[in-house]
């Protein structure tokens, strides 16, 4: 019975989230065509079970694997600059020297590759690969027709992490 209620709740949340429009279709088509937009992350989905166990052990935890994020996280994509400021919850495979206070995935790249395709459902898929960073990153961004988006970030030094969010016109 609990699993039936859980499935019904997830289906209801999916339907209610899918009907909200984050960016008008004409604006969405324009920013996707120009490849100049902002991705605003609203939720993080860590894959590391150590992080999930810590989250579940905290007082008031609901046993979820989703972290709601404060505004200000995401990335800005322009023709000549890819600026990223995302939190990171997970394990790095090797220690990298740098500022310990500058956690997360934060960098600016001027040398990056973009591959654009369309999924079977008609969504746009961007694969953005950095070239000029010490740690190579691959960003898989699926953009839905209502302006919402799902981002998966993988690296040669960290466990993957995913984010849910929406697009806006580049500032």
Regions of interest found by a model, annotated:
Residues 26-44:
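Post-signal peptide N-terminal segment of mature Sec-exported envelope proteins
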């Amino acid at each position: 019975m609990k699993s039936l209620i859980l499935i019904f709740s997830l289906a209801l949340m999916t339907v209610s989230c899918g009907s909200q429009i984050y960016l008008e279709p004409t604006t969405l088509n324009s920013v996707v065509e120009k490849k100049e937009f902002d991705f605003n992350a609203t939720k993080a989905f860590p894959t590391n079970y150590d992080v999930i166990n810590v989250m579940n052990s905290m007082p008031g935890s609901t046993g979820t694997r989703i972290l709601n994020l404060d505004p200000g996280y995401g990335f800005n994509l322009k023709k000549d600059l890819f600026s990223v400021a995302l939190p990171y919850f997970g394990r790095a495979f090797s220690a990298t020297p740098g500022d310990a206070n500058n956690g997360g995935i934060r960098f600016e790249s001027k040398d990056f590759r973009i591959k654009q395709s369309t999924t079977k459902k008609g969504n746009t898929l961007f694969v953005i690969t950095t070239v000029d960073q010490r740690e190579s990153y691959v960003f898989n961004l699926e953009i839905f027709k209502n302006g919402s988006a799902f981002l998966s970030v993988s690296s040669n030094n960290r466990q993957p992490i995913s984010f849910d969010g929406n697009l806006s016109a580049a500032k």
